[in-house]
Each structure stands twice: as structure tokens, then as C-alpha cells.
A protein has these predicted regions:
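Fungal secretory targeting signals
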Residues: 1-19
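Structured recognition/catalytic domains enriched at protein termini
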Residues: 13-156
């Protein structure tokens, strides 16, 4: 029984995921009925690029152009950090990188402030967190949150 508990704990703490803003099919997203309890798995093995192959969902949060998105990463295997990119997309396929952290993401920090450009267009958008781990197998992780941006001055 103890071995089963330890193995269960190991898988429960496996890898990392974006918790805020709440990603598609996340346990952190209110009202989701088809929760993905494997959000910490890398892409591949049934989870495709972009956004783990999940279709767009409800808007998890609204932001104003120029505002910072407070991002929280959680999980138990940060692989000694790595490289994170935070990006926005309006079509769910083409992403514009708006913030990069080299070498130290998500370790030691797990909270990030990512500013939306002031001239970013208004409308529904996809906010993506992409992570390449530093040690172990080279893996790519991605979580996407459906957001809405208001007050932008660019063209949509």
C-alpha cells in the first residue's frame, strides 16, 4: 500500500503546468466538465501542438492592453529550470512571443509578470506558456488560456 501511495504521489507531482491564468481543460478553470488531469505531460503521446490539441474554450480572464498577466506555474518536477516563453495568438495557430525567461524557468521562480503590449489589438486571444526543460529528456510543454484583451490600439 505504501508503494502504491508513493507512486501515486510521484505521478501527481510530475512535471509542471500553468495554473494562472487557468488553461483550457484545467482543474483551475471554473465550469470545466472535461478536466484534463494530465496537464503536466509534455506534448506528444496524444497531446499535440498547439495547446495540447485542445479547442478554444471559455474566456478565463479579461485584461486591458498594457496590463500585466500574473502567471503561476505549479508542479513537482521543474527539471532544474529551463526556458519559458509566454505568447499571444488571435487565431490559435500563430503565436507572438511577448516574454522569455532563459535558464531559470520555472526554477527558482514560479510566478511571472508578463505585460501585454499596449498596442496589442482588442479581442479574444490565446495566452500560451511554453517550456523546454533544462535537464532530462528534451521535452516541450504547453498550456493555453483563452483570454480577452480590451483597450488595445492595434488592428485586430
Amino acid at each position: 500500500m505504501k508503494l502504491v501511495s508513493l507512486l501515486t504521489l510521484q505521478f501527481a507531482l510530475a512535471h509542471m503546468e500553468m495554473a494562472k491564468p487557468a488553461p483550457r481543460r484545467s482543474k483551475h478553470l471554473k465550469g470545466v466538465t472535461n478536466v484534463d488531469y494530465d496537464m503536466t505531460s509534455p506534448l506528444g503521446g496524444g497531446f499535440s501542438y498547439p495547446c495540447r490539441g485542445f479547442p478554444s474554450g471559455p474566456v478565463s480572464k479579461k485584461y486591458t492592453a498594457g496590463q500585466a498577466i500574473n502567471v503561476a506555474i505549479e508542479g513537482g518536477a521543474p527539471h532544474n529550470g529551463g526556458h519559458c516563453q509566454f505568447a499571444l495568438s488571435f487565431n490559435g495557430q500563430d503565436f507572438v512571443n511577448i516574454h522569455t525567461v532563459f535558464g531559470t524557468c520555472p526554477q527558482p521562480e514560479r510566478s511571472f509578470s508578463v505585460q501585454i503590449p499596449k498596442n496589442f489589438p482588442s479581442g479574444k486571444a490565446v495566452f500560451a506558456w511554453v517550456w523546454n526543460n533544462r535537464v532530462g529528456n528534451r521535452e516541450l510543454y504547453m498550456n493555453c488560456s483563452d483570454i480577452e484583451i480590451t483597450g488595445g490600439s492595434g488592428m485586430s
